[in-house]
Structures are given as C-alpha cells and as structure tokens.
Amino acid sequence: MKSIGRLLKSVVQWFDSDYGSDDLATARDRADKVDPGRCAAFLFLHACCLGVLWVGWSWTAVWSAVFLYFVRMFAITGFYHRYFSHRTFSTSRPMQFVLALWGAACVQRGALWWAYTHRHHHKHSDEAEDKHSPVVDGFWWSHIGWITSKKNFPTDYKQIPDLAKYPELVFLNRFDTLVPIIFATGLFLTG
C-alpha cells in the first residue's frame, strides 16, 4: 500500500511541484541519487527527436528548431540567470511574469526553483553543500544527475523572499510542467 501511495505522490508531483514538499529538511536528508521516474521522462523527451526518422523533416521545422533554440537559451541566460538569480536589471511586474513564462518554456523548471538553486550554488560553490559542483561530484552529476535527484526537487521559498512574494511566479514555479506541455502541444498542432 505504501508503494502505491509513493507512486501516486510521484505522479501528482509531475504536475504540482510543491505537493508534499512541506518538509524541506526531509528532502535535504535524502540520498543524492537519480530518481528513475524523472529520468524516464527526460530520456523519453530526448528519444522523441528520433521521430524525425519516421515523419521526415522540412526547412520550416529546421529553422523553427534553430530559432527556438536561441530564443530559449536567451531566456535561460538572460532571464532565469541574470534577472531571477542575480537581479542584474529591473523590470515591471507584468514583464517579470512574461520573462518567467518565457523561461518556463525551456523545461528547466520554474524561475523560483532556478533562482533558489543558483543562489544556493553561489553561496556554497564547490563545497559539499553545492548541488551541482563538478569538483565535488564530477561532470555527469554536475550537468545532469543533480536535476533528476529527489533531494534537489523542492524549492526553498524562504531563501528567495524577493521572488516568492509574487503569487503569479509561485504558480508558474509550482506547476512548472504546464507551460512546456502547452508550448509543445502548440508546436505540434501548428505542424
């Protein structure tokens, strides 16, 4: 019965990241190991690219992919990193929401989670507490493994009070799969 409960909790957390993450201390005490459920979705998404072998390609699809790559990379470097993590520039509240929405389409979780983990990284760079240090944990863990770890899943809103005061950002952070699902569906429907 416990395993069914854990499975259901895991499924609900795919759609509501904050579900069951009230106890951050418990999450921090978990072993740093890869969560198979999160890995399966990660691998499936990348394997879907092989679908081009069956459906073919077009120049429109290629140029769309190139355009979206650069636009979404800019969203991560310019907005998630420079704005939300380091607050290197200021903007209006509506534009802040647009920036978070744009970044959410990149499937790197919510802006608040990103800012929290990045600020934590700077506070503990290359120390045992650093969530993704290549010096402490090696190349693969620092680039891929840490993202799929249950230990690193929750957002500690107390560490980002400047951002957590905006309910619209908390919503995007909490339901971080919503924007990518809508974005992918829109791309699929437009051909």
Segments and roles (model prediction):
Residues 1-191:
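Non-catalytic, topology-defining segments of multipass membrane proteins
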